[in-house]
Amino acid sequence: MGEKCIKRDCLHLCFSYMSGKVIIFPVESNTAHVKVTPALNKIFFSVTVCLRFLSDYNKEQAPGDGRYRLYIGDKGVFFYGLPTGLNQWHSVCVTWDSGTGLAQIWVNGRPSARKALQAGASIAGTPSIMLGQDQDAYAGGFHVYDAFYGHATDVHMCDTVLSPSEIKDYMKCVISRPGNVVDWTNMEYSKHGYVIQENITLYTK
């Protein structure tokens, strides 16, 4: 299925069937991003976010030592020893549960140790979901050294912790449980700045 777009105030507002599409952030920028409108507006006590990415980003701020960092609110935790190879597609799923406070990252089918992060907390208010930028403030606070520089696809977000079998399916490019907050195959979004959308068939996952 195709993409329906209108142009308003120099901004493309799209409602897209994104299956088979990839978003490219081709330059380091503090403006280029994709804003995603969530399908649910609620208080979140658990989440799973999955995506696939490819990049050759390797700066001092991202030393390429298998390190990933997850934030819930203003608290973060590092996960180590996971795949981060340059110019390779990586499938990533992140889970967090408020009840137990446990967070985990899966990369290319490999699960991290589960670590404590913000037990009893919640994610309240309208979610501000941005692809390509790190938000140091709600819907803003972008810095070029925090920006994503590369390709991204298959973004899904659920309001629950997916099971290991569901995550393993995702790692095999099988979407057994599409996101009910963000579903890459059917989401409303807007592109800002230098952002390109192409067919994933031009690349190798």
Model-assigned labels for residue ranges:
Residues M1-K205:
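Extracellular glycan-associated modules
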